[in-house]
Amino acid sequence: GERDGLRENVLLVRFAQARRTQSPSGGLLEARAAMNHAGHPLLWKTLGMRFMGQDGRGGKAYAEHVHGEIARQHRLDKSALARMATAADLDNLAVVTQSHGPLTVTVLATAGAKSNAIRTGVDAGTYIEGYTPAGTINIMVLTNIRLTDAAMARALITVTEGKTAALQDLNVPSTYTK
């Protein structure tokens, strides 16, 4: 879709029943759905300024507004919605499903590292919670079985290792290192 003439899309995955999830917006929660909200970089900038309040959370307030809209449209309690947000285009979505024995895992990933790739261990760590993040590679992992909190934490580590290896294999350099 569009907002203010700029690209804005939402990927929403509904669950048949509440699922224990881990989300960058909300942490561990019992979710009825998971979403990835994608807005054009200029949309984040302009709406971030429009949503800028006394608390200085422009982009975050814009994302929370969209998350609330989506929850209302789909008759979901916002607290039961695992949420992510990105400026990466959802047209850059990769979907892969693999099975092993009784386990099936589907991964939905969006990436936008052409102009905002930050490399841990190379670039200065300037991101602080509550300030505007510099970019994202969002990865949604869906399974057909319930994972314990410890298993979700282990899966997050494995996904991060895989993402790191993929960026190295693709020779994606930092766009910030001089």
Protein language model regions, located:
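Alpha/propeptide regions of enzymes that mature by internal proteolysis
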Residues: 1-178
